[in-house]
A protein has these predicted regions:
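Catalytic core of the metallo-beta-lactamase
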Residues: 4, 10, 126-186
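Gly-rich Lys/Arg/Thr-decorated short loops/hinges at beta-loop-alpha junctions or inter-strand turns
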Residues: 191-203
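Beta-sheet entry/capping signal
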Residues: 5, 14, 66-68, 165-168, ...
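Conserved small/polar residues in nucleotide/adenosyl-binding loops
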Residues: 218-224
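Pre-active-site segment of Zn-dependent metallo-hydrolases
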Residues: 10-66, 70-124, 174-185, 211
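Charged helix-capping and loop-helix junction motifs
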Residues: 209-215
Length: 228
């Protein structure tokens, strides 16, 4: 899964929309950042999944000191997930270094540490849904619930430059309807420009399968036939 990260330059500000880690690749292929961290004013986070947040501690490690805006549930989830990701980075670096020592190779450092993750969490600001927030003159945002994950959101952004206001929408990952616990996605009725997630956009999704029935069938089938 690709790491999501978009740079928005508007109203004299530079904001990242998400800062994710590319999953399924070697951790050291994730290290280059697409921007100079010290030149970013802030980050807007759509949701807590690592492909949308996994490089935030690396951003902080390399000099980012702005604010990170997310919904309150996303902030709470990131507190767990970013620390967990950092533990993995440290463990993998330790494992690589044991192999490197035996091979006489140069040691490696983790992409980031638990300390970096904790520093990143200090920059988070938990926001409410459906509340407009002025980040700077001419730059207003609002988080909208989209039912993908606890705290997940689309982000509406109003940019006013030279007396003209333009509305942007960053969809984030959008969930399905009629899910237990998670609310249905909120419909956004208008926008001048929409930046849409499309990781699975070329696939046809049929009705949600009966997972409980499938598990029960598997449980009954395996002991008798060892085949599914």
């Amino acid at each position: 899964v690709t790491g999501r990260c978009t740079l928005l330059e508007a109203a004299g500000q530079r904001y990242l929309i998400d800062c994710g880690m590319e999953q399924g690749k070697d951790v050291y292929e994730n290290q280059p950042l697409p921007v100079a961290p010290g030149e970013i004013d802030g980050v807007l986070v759509t949701h807590a999944h690592i492909d949308h947040t996994g490089q935030l501690p690396l951003l902080v490690r390399n000099g980012f000191r702005g604010r990170i805006y997310a919904t309150k549930p996303t902030t709470q989830l990131c507190s767990i997930m970013l620390r967990d990701s950092a533990h993995i980075q440290e463990f993998e670096a330790e494992w690589k270094n044991r192999k490197a020592k035996r091979a006489g190779a140069e040691p490696v450092e983790p992409m980031y540490t638990v300390q970096d993750a904790e520093a990143a969490m200090q920059l988070f600001r938990g926001m409410e849904y459906n509340t407009k927030i002025e980040l700077a003159p001419g730059l207003v945002i609002r988080f909208i619930d989209v039912g993908h994950l606890l705290g997940s959101s689309s982000i509406e952004i109003w940019v006013t430059e030279s007396g003209t206001t333009t509305k942007l929408v960053f969809s984030g990952d959008i969930g399905n309807q009629h899910q237990p616990i998670i609310k249905d996605p909120t419909t956004i009725r208008d926008a001048d420009y929409v930046f849409m997630e499309s990781t699975y956009g070329d696939r046809s999704h049929g009705p949600r399968p009966d997972y409980v029935g499938a598990v029960s069938y598997t449980h009954l089938t395996l002991p008798t036939t060892s085949r599914v």
